[in-house]
Swiss-Prot record:
Its main location: secreted. Monomer. Homodimer. This is Beta-defensin 1. One of its GO terms (molecular function) is identical protein binding. Pfam families: Defensin_beta. It comes from Saguinus oedipus (Cotton-top tamarin). One of its GO terms (biological process) is positive regulation of flagellated sperm motility involved in capacitation. Has bactericidal activity. May act as a ligand for C-C chemokine receptor CCR6. Positively regulates the sperm motility and bactericidal activity in a CCR6-dependent manner. Binds to CCR6 and triggers Ca2+ mobilization in the sperm which is important for its motility.
């Protein structure tokens, strides 16, 4: 019986925090911008993109460019 109360308590804590929008549930399935860049064939650079490449997005939270 105590374990069911504990599970219910944990569930309430998770669901009560959902109004802020920053729970761990919103991060499920979310990939970092660096991962998406490299998986798409690009590379993350802090400097300008090399010749014959274009900026396709950002990396590291907008601090670098994804060049492809």
């Amino acid at each position: 019986m105590r374990t069911s109360y504990l599970l219910l308590f944990i569930l309430c804590l998770v669901l009560c925090d959902m109004d802020s929008g920053d729970t761990f549930l919103t991060g499920l399935g979310h990939r970092s911008d660096h991962y998406n860049c490299v998986k798409g064939g690009g590379q993350c650079l802090y400097s300008a993109c090399p010749i014959y490449t274009k900026v396709q997005g950002t990396c590291y939270g907008g601090k670098a460019k994804c060049c492809k």
